[in-house]
Amino acid sequence: MINPSHETAIKWLQANGNRKVGIMGMSTAGMDSLVAASYFPDITLTFALTASDFVWQGFEQGNKDGCKEWPIPETSTLSWKGEPLPYMPFVYEHPVYWQKIEEETKGSGDIERSTCLFIDSEKAREHTEEEMIKVENIKGKLFLVGAEDDSFWEAGKYIRRMDQRLKERPHTCEYVPLVYEHGTHFVLPESMLRMALPVGLKFVLRFIFRAAKEYPKECEATRKDIDKKLSAALKEWRAE
């Protein structure tokens, strides 16, 4: 939700000695980060990892009729000032939504695959301009990071579309599109992942993602490159 708490957080940071405000998010939070940065010009560094270039229909996770996730009818994932943002509706409703995930996941080698939800929903109808994220409004520095072998959605394609959108529209941000052949959905900096999982990182990744099992060296190289690039960008941004 893009709500007053974002603005409150920015003002609090600035009032407590922070000259600059940055934002970082991965997966659904990557989309959230992009939207927030497009609304708040005080955000001058954005790291969007595996982010989509559009807002999605809302969804819930838990247990409903044997399903672990389901779409919420006529609901957006994000809102602004109490009003839902336009969104791409999923072509599948409950319970078919989760059944499609199960079908795609079966025998894939991934603990979960959901690319069909997004591919089929995009085929069912063209995106409206209203539901696309206005990345051209983002200020400062913008890093768009994703991998072609993402098992959740087509992160690489979304980054290329944002790249094209920025080429076609006036913007002031300095942006860097980073699309890797191998990296899985977890295109996090290596050091950050190791903080979260100091022991057994490679085992966990191989258990979750087939690509991490088949291309362990390439995926690790991707994470280390991301670490290097984002760390350098953060250091430069802080020094400006």
Predicted regions and their residues:
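Alpha/beta-hydrolase fold nucleophile elbow
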Residues: 16-27
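Short glycine-enriched nucleophile-adjacent loop
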Residues: 30-41, 46-47
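Accessory cap/linker subdomain of secreted extracellular hydrolases
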Residues: 47-135
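Short beta-strand/loop motif that positions the catalytic acidic residue
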Residues: 138, 144-146
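Acidic catalytic loop of the alpha/beta-hydrolase fold
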Residues: 149-153, 184-187
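C-terminal catalytic histidine-bearing segment of alpha/beta-hydrolase fold enzymes
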Residues: 160, 171-240
